[in-house]
Design a protein with these regions (language model features):
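A short LG(V/I)-centered, amphipathic sequence patch enriched
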Residues: 1-12
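Hydrophobic hinge/microswitch elements
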Residues: 162-205
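Alpha-helix/helix-capping structural signal
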Residues: 52-53, 121-122, 145-148, 174, ...
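Alpha-helical linker/hinge and terminal dimerization helices associated
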Residues: 19-40
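Immediate post-signal peptide segment of exported/extracytoplasmic ligand-binding proteins
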Residues: 39-46, 134-136
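Central regulatory/effector-binding core of bacterial HTH transcription factors
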Residues: 43-103
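Hydrophobic residues within well-ordered alpha-helices
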Residues: 13-16, 86, 135, 178-183, ...
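Acidic, Gly/Pro-rich loop/turn segments at junctions of secondary structure
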Residues: 76-169
Length: 205
């Protein structure tokens, strides 16, 4: 088992500590750690928690390939923005989006991201967008869940004169991405979350 109960509450067992240290990198690295746990404790159930947009847009498209590598493993994926406590919530892996400021946890980076503007070719048709400054004349879509918003991003690029309200504001990245796919404006999003839409030619950076 991964956790054991003591007078101080739930604590990691030796196997649990080994598992957490092994979990790093992308899905193949998660898979290596999972395989080790299965061999050590014959566990056939992997419980994963992640943020909703990351779970839907990045993790889910890769789960089938992961399952093919470990066909006997049952996978449970729970998505929320809540802070997970491993002992309380019965979670094996928590995939978080942030700046690694979790001092009580063993944290490994799965993948670094880039935050870029994305839009559909339909929206860009007939619009002359050649520079960052040209974005000021466009419909910018805001997502509450991104670590970097339009205001900060434009300031970092030393773009001045931006003082407009967003026509569309969403609290989930997958909603912002879908709005951009529908030609409703330009989003500022993670290349990881928008990657599938780009590969399918629904969006372009």
């Amino acid at each position: 088992k991964i956790f054991s109960r003591s007078s101080k509450g739930m604590v990691l067992t030796t196997i649990g500590e080994k598992y957490l240290k092994e979990v790093s990198g992308a899905l193949n690295i998660i898979g290596q750690a999972t395989n080790q746990v299965i061999n050590d404790i014959h566990q056939d159930y992997l419980r994963i928690h992640s943020a909703p947009s990351f779970g839907l847009l990045w993790l889910m498209p890769r789960l089938d390939k992961f399952r093919q590598a470990w066909p006997e493993l049952k996978i449970s994926l729970t998505c929320s923005y809540e802070s997970i406590q491993f002992s309380r919530d019965n979670i094996d892996i928590d995939i978080r989006h942030g700046l690694s400021q979790w001092p009580t946890l063993v944290v490994k980076t799965i993948k670094n991201e880039r935050v870029l503007p994305f839009s559909s070719s339909t929206y860009l048709a007939g619009r002359d967008v050649q520079s960052i400054e040209d974005l000021l004349a466009c419909d910018l879509i805001h997502s509450d869940s991104t670590l970097i918003g339009w205001s900060n991003w434009l300031s970092w690029h030393k773009v001045r004169g931006w003082n407009k309200n967003f026509i569309f504001n969403f609290d989930r990245s997958y909603m912002s991405i879908e709005a951009a796919r529908m030609g409703m404006g330009i989003i500022l999003e993670s290349n990881l979350l928008a990657g599938q839409s780009v590969s399918q030619r629904h969006l372009e950076p």
